[in-house]
Amino acid sequence: MADKPDMGEINSFDKAKLKKTETQEKNTLPTKETIEQEKQAK
């Protein structure tokens, strides 16, 4: 591993190659109601 990053590689990086992606919420926290229902089910 090099101590310093390769700045030439960073500067020559082509941002046009990156694809635009849609961000989606994945791990949303359960509501208090959901937690209570799960506790009742056990």
UniProtKB/Swiss-Prot annotation:
Keywords: Acetylation, Actin-binding, Cytoplasm, Cytoskeleton, Phosphoprotein. Residues 1-42 are annotated as: Disordered. Disulfide bonds: none annotated. GO terms for cellular component: cytoplasm; cytoskeleton. Signal peptide: none annotated. Belongs to the thymosin beta family. The modification N-acetylalanine is found at residue 2. This is Thymosin beta-10. The modification Phosphothreonine is found at residues 21, 23, 34. Its main location: cytoplasm. GO terms for molecular function: actin monomer binding. Plays an important role in the organization of the cytoskeleton. Binds to and sequesters actin monomers (G actin) and therefore inhibits actin polymerization. The modification N6-acetyllysine is found at residues 4, 15, 39. Residues 1-25, 33-42 have a biased composition (Basic and acidic residues). The modification Phosphoserine is found at residue 12. One of its GO terms (biological process) is actin filament organization. InterPro entries: Beta-thymosin, Beta-thymosin_sf. It is found in: Cytoplasm, Cytoskeleton.
